[in-house]
Curated annotation (Swiss-Prot):
Lineage, broadest ranks: Bacteria, Pseudomonadati, Pseudomonadota, Alphaproteobacteria, Hyphomicrobiales
Localization: Cytoplasm
Similarity comment: family membership: Belongs to the ClpX chaperone family. HslU subfamily.
Biological-process GO terms, alphabetical: protein unfolding; proteolysis involved in protein catabolic process
Gene Ontology CC: one annotated term: HslUV protease complex
Keyword line: ATP-binding, Chaperone, Cytoplasm, Nucleotide-binding, Stress response
Organism: Brucella suis (strain ATCC 23445 / NCTC 10510)
Protein purpose: ATPase subunit of a proteasome-like degradation complex; this subunit has chaperone activity. The binding of ATP and its subsequent hydrolysis by HslU are essential for unfolding of protein substrates subsequently hydrolyzed by HslV. HslU recognizes the N-terminal part of its protein substrates and unfolds these before they are guided to HslV for hydrolysis.
Residues binding ATP: 18, 60-65, 247, 312, 384
Name of this protein: ATP-dependent protease ATPase subunit HslU
Length: 434
């Protein structure tokens, strides 16, 4: 587990997300508290629970991005779900325990990737031997193998086609089993059991020497890994480091005087309660305790209010953070200051066609102005509006770029207004196009 200080976490998030200092501080403290808990011993370590977070703010201001970047920074298993996708237990639809099962699957992938890195050197040597077997046969003399090995390492054999045998991990079909706690168990993994009994199924693949290496390295890595250890480690990582982001929690808040779907909405909240408070969820890999999983919830709360959530659920989300709507200056900074800003992305994309894009300062001002105006007059979708505006401005250049290799386009305020000014003024049209 990474031991970044809260200040380091915030400065890392600043590289990708503009503004929203309060939200960044809240998640930074939550992540640091996890590290602090890991340093504790015995009973006290069990007693310290994570302080779950409720983010309140309009769409497109960075709620999801903050959580996603945080999980990446921590190297923790992260799952994002929308509260509206779930139904009360007993109704048709996904139940909330599926969130934890998805988290475990993601943790297994993470742990396996880390373990593969540890054995990569050994796996690479084994893969090389298998490529040699395919090229010269298993019975070839050591001298022949050595001469071919030299050619292999010099890249002389890269384009030669070979046939390789790789283990067939053909996905066994998964079935939802009604009333079973570990649903999605699959056909009780009969194919897995048979595979182990018969030494594993293999299939033959035809590929070039160069392309065979990644496949064989993965195959050899998996042979060197202990799957049971990976599962145990993944279960531990899910319990101690997992982060669950539940979006649109405001949509399941019962509005005052509401009726109809309110029953199911409240039911989803009641099902979330034990998950957020701490319960044990059955998965096909084993039970997972949710006591120390960090839950970050978010919602715009345009129609409902946080106080419309069940009081018990409100109590389990002790940290409230309000994210502010984006200003014109924020839009300017999003276009220019973030690590992979939209402008940098478009410049890089056009470079692949040998077309050079240059944006003047007044063009950036014009883009920010149009995005702010559209958010105010049409619908406030936050930073996502910039993508729509940029696509419209660069539509012509993107379309004709393959025929304009070597050209340089200078995007200034006049160009932006020419491409988009009329549409932005015509509110009726911009409702549909921007």
């Amino acid at each position: 587990m990474s031991n970044f200080s809260p200040r380091e976490i915030v400065s890392e998030l600043d590289r990708f997300i503009i503004g929203q200092k309060d939200a960044k501080r809240a998640v930074a403290i939550a992540l640091r508290n996890r590290w602090r808990r890991q340093q504790l011993e015995g009973q006290m370590r069990e007693e310290v629970m994570p302080k779950n977070i409720l983010m309140i703010g309009p769409t497109g201001v960075g709620k999801t991005e903050i959580s996603r970047r945080l999980a990446k920074l921590a190297g923790a298993p992260f799952v994002k779900v929308e509260a509206t996708k779930f139904t009360e237990v007993g109704y048709v639809g996904r139940d909330v325990e599926q969130i934890i099962r998805d988290l475990v699957e993601i943790a297994i992938t993470l742990v396996r990737e880390k373990r593969r890195e540890d054995v990569k050197a050994k796996a690479h040597l084994n893969a090389e031997e298998r490529v040699l077997d395919a090229l010269v046969g298993k019975t070839a003399s050591p001298a022949t193998r050595d001469s071919f090995r030299k050619k292999l390492r010099n890249g002389e054999m890269d384009d030669k086609e070979i046939e390789i045998e790789v283990s067939d991990s053909g996905a066994s079909p998964n079935f939802e089993i009604p009333g079973m706690p570990g649903a999605n168990i699959g056909v009780l993994n009969i194919s897995d059991m048979l595979g182990k009994a018969m030494g594993g199924r293999t299939k033959t693949r035809k590929t070039t020497v160069k392309d065979s290496y990644p496949i064989l390295i993965n195959d050899e890595s998996d042979k060197l890994l202990d799957q049971d250890q990976i599962v145990q480690e993944a279960l531990r990582v899910s319990e101690d480091e997992g982060i669950v982001f539940i979006d649109e929690i405001d949509k399941i808040a019962a509005r005052e005087g509401g009726s109809g779907a309110g029953v199911s909405r409240e039911g989803v909240q009641r099902d979330l309660l034990p998950l957020v408070e701490g319960t044990t969820v059955a998965t096909k890999y084993g039970p997972v305790k949710t006591d120390h999983i960090l839950f970050i919830t978010s919602g715009a709360f345009h129609v409902s209010k946080p106080s419309d959530l069940l009081p018990e659920l409100q109590g389990r989300l002790p940290i409230r953070v309000e994210l502010s709507a984006l200003t014109r200056e924020d839009f300017r900074r999003i276009l220019t200051e973030t690590e992979a800003s939209l402008i940098k992305q478009y410049i890089a994309l056009m470079e692949t066609e040998e077309v050079k894009l240059e944006f003047s300062d007044d063009a950036i001002d014009a883009l920010a102005d149009i995005a702010v105006d559209l958010n105010a007059t049409v619908e406030n979708i936050g930073a996502r509006r910039l993508q729509t505006v940029m696509e419209k401005v660069l539509d012509e250049i993107s379309f004709t770029a393959p025929d304009k290799a070597g050209a340089t386009f200078i995007i200034d305020a006049a160009y932006v207004k020419e491409k988009i000014g009329g549409l932005a003024k015509n509110t009726d049209l911009s409702r549909f196009i921007l």
